[in-house]
Every structure is written in structure tokens, then in C-alpha cells.
Amino acid sequence: MSTLRLLISDSYDPWFNLAVEECIFRQMPATQRVLFLWRNADTVVIGRAQNPWKECNTRRMEEDNVRLARRSSGGGAVFHDLGNTCFTFMAGKPEYDKTISTSIVLNALNALGVSAEASGRNDLVVKTAEGDRKVSGSAYRETKDRGFHHGTLLLNADLSRLANYLNPDKKKLAAKGITSVRSRVTNLTELLPGITHEQVCEAITKAFFAHYGERVEAEIISPDKTPDLPNFAEIFARQSSWEWNFGQAPAFSHLLDERFSWGGVELHFDVEKGHITRAQVFTDSLNPAPLEALAGRLQGGLYRADMLQQECEALLVDFPDQEKELRELSTWIAGAVR
């Protein structure tokens, strides 16, 4: 029996596609290797720990019938239309390795005639006369026994619409050394005129099969033909809910934000009588777990620099691999509230 599984979605509904992804990830055998290919109609997809009101122009999105979808991985906000091809690779540990899935995508692009390379923490770029241009962005998620890598390839996306719905973080733009979103991305059609979603999916599928030395039949799925996934209706209801995608607007009396080399951080505090009655953390960090834990620790504590710093440093026990990030965060918070 093959250890591979290939699913291709005929749906353009971001909530359906992300719910399928979540279901498969939760329920797949640890020995299985999964490739899921999909695309979304007009959607802003935000990272698990992001604040949609800061990241998106929600008024313009509503006017233009652009959906908001919160994914379960970290990272930043992106705009999807039918000019994007989305891919998700899943595998159990210890086999899960994002460098393998990255190489599969690079091999697929090479087979199509595009020479691309990995750049930074989550991008694929091509070299042009104007410099490196991004053609793909990715995000990742890991649990104790499995992981996934998902991302998008820009085929023929309407790049002019990016600025309509995304509010660029000025500190992020400065940190990346760029002047505009449009200047740093390009479509694959600029390199391969006429390239289609179907051709890209076929190339990725062939590279996936070639890497593992196996082939399987594709499962074509849609809302009318859902895969056999227990609890899919429940997960779809959550994925499409306002509570998941927007949540409650943060009520705060003090806002702190900063951009570090590893991502942006925004802290929202409500403070009453010197105590933090509510703490929220939003971030586009690819590993938001320590920051999510920090929010819980700050709840109910004193709004004092030394106490906040102490709570940051206490997280080093649970997140030793993020020592650099936590120490930078601790120093910044202490200085910001003094």
C-alpha cells in the first residue's frame, strides 16, 4: 500500500480548503506523506497569531467581497486570487523536513524552465534584470509527531490588488530593505507566458512522485465531493466562523509594537489599578507559540517593567530554543513601559 496521498481541490473557497488541510493534518497516519494542491478566490489569508484589523483593510475587503481566512500556521498576511497556486506538504516525524518539500517545488519549477532558489526564512525567488523577485512564500506548522509546509506560487496574480487589502507594516518594509510590495514580487507568467494552474500542479505532482519513487491516483475534492474525513463539518464551521477569523476586537489602553529580525510583535494591554486585566499578543513570527504563552502569563500581573521582564524570562524554561527572541522581547518590553 502506498504511503503517498494526493488531493486536488476543485473548490475556490478558502474556508473549505483550509478546513480540508486541517482535517488531514490532524488525522493522517504518521507514516503518510501528503500533497494537497488548491487555490482560493479573492481572499486575504492571515497568520494564526495576527490581528486582522491591523493587517487588513477590512472595510475595502467587505466592499469588494474579499474573504478573510485565518490559517493555523504562523507568518504574515497574503492576498490570494485565482492567479495563485497553493500547495501543502505533510509528513510525520522524523521524516518531516521542510527542505524536502522546498526542493520538490524547486524541482517542479526547474522542470517548467524556471530557475528559482530559496531565500530568507520562507521565500522562493528568481533572478531578473531588476534583481531578485519573489515568486513564492511559505509558512510552516509542527506538532509533536508531524509537520506541514504550505505556500503559494504566483502565476498570474493581480499584483495591483495587494495594496488594496493589505496594510504594509512600515517597520517590516524597512527591515526587508524594500520600497513597495509590488517591487519585490513577480508572476511566473513574466517568465513563462501562458503558464497555467493545471501545468504547475502537474509539475509539482511529478516532482513529488519522483522524490518518493511512488505514484498514487489523485483524489479530486470539492464541497460536493468531500473526502472521508471525520469531524470535517465541525472543523469547517470553525474555519468559516467570525470567532476564528476575526475574534473580538481588542480593547486596550496601551499598545506597544516593534519589529525584530524574526518578526513583528504587537502587544495590547488593558490595565486597571496597576494590574493587567487583559493581554493580547499579535505576531507574524513563524513560531508564535512563546508569544502566545506570554499573553497567558501576563494576564492578571502588575503592569511594571520588572514584572513584565520577569515573565518573559520565565518562558526560557519552556522555550529554550527561542532564547534570543525572548531576551530581545524582554529588553524591549521593559524599556517600552518604563
UniProtKB/Swiss-Prot annotation:
Gene3D superfamilies: Bira Bifunctional Protein, Domain 2, CO dehydrogenase flavoprotein, C-terminal domain. GO terms for molecular function: ATP binding; lipoate-protein ligase activity; lipoyltransferase activity. GO terms for biological process: protein modification process. Its EC number is 6.3.1.20. The keyword Membrane does not apply. It comes from the Bacteria. PROSITE patterns: BPL_LPL_CATALYTIC (PS51733). Pathway: Protein modification; protein lipoylation via exogenous pathway; protein N(6)-(lipoyl)lysine from lipoate: step 1/2; Protein modification; protein lipoylation via exogenous pathway; protein N(6)-(lipoyl)lysine from lipoate: step 2/2. It is found in: Cytoplasm. The keyword Transmembrane helix does not apply. Keywords: ATP-binding, Cytoplasm, Ligase, Nucleotide-binding. Transmembrane segments: none annotated. Belongs to the LplA family. Monomer. In the transfer reaction, the free carboxyl group of lipoic acid is attached via an amide linkage to the epsilon-amino group of a specific lysine residue of lipoyl domains of lipoate-dependent enzymes. This is Lipoate-protein ligase A.
